[in-house]
């Protein structure tokens, strides 16, 4: 399996990638997919999972916490520590 996601996967939004991943999981869980097709859609599922992980990391990096002064007025932002 290649390390890089196929070009079409790299263009998907988080929501679209997650929707397709859920469809793949349902098909695999159903157990009615031939072996060769199962392997192919499993590999696509892995690429979709990597895409979702990448987009989540990007979103997390952009989330900021609003900082306030002593009176509670917003004065800026700083990275949100989600840990």
Swiss-Prot record:
It is an enzyme of class 3 (hydrolase). It holds the Pfam family Exonuc_VII_S. GO terms for cellular component: cytosol; exodeoxyribonuclease VII complex. InterPro entries: Exonuc_VII_S, Exonuc_VII_ssu_sf. One of its GO terms (molecular function) is exodeoxyribonuclease VII activity. GO terms for biological process: DNA catabolic process. It is found in: Cytoplasm. Its EC number is 3.1.11.6. Keywords: Cytoplasm, Exonuclease, Hydrolase, Nuclease. Its main location: cytoplasm. It catalyses: Exonucleolytic cleavage in either 5'- to 3'- or 3'- to 5'-direction to yield nucleoside 5'-phosphates. It comes from the Bacteria. PANTHER family: EXODEOXYRIBONUCLEASE 7 SMALL SUBUNIT. Belongs to the XseB family. Bidirectionally degrades single-stranded DNA into large acid-insoluble oligonucleotides, which are then degraded further into small acid-soluble oligonucleotides. Heterooligomer composed of large and small subunits. This is Exodeoxyribonuclease 7 small subunit. It comes from Rhodopseudomonas palustris (strain BisB5). The gene is xseB.
């Amino acid at each position: 399996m290649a390390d890089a996601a196929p070009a079409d996967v790299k263009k998907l939004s988080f929501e679209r990638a997650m929707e397709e991943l859920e469809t793949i999981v349902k098909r695999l869980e159903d157990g009615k997919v031939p072996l060769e097709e199962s392997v192919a859609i499993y590999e696509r599922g892995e690429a979709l999972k990597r895409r979702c992980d990448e987009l989540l990391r990007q979103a997390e990096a952009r989330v900021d916490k609003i900082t306030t002064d002593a009176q509670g007025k917003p004065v800026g932002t700083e990275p949100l520590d989600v840990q």
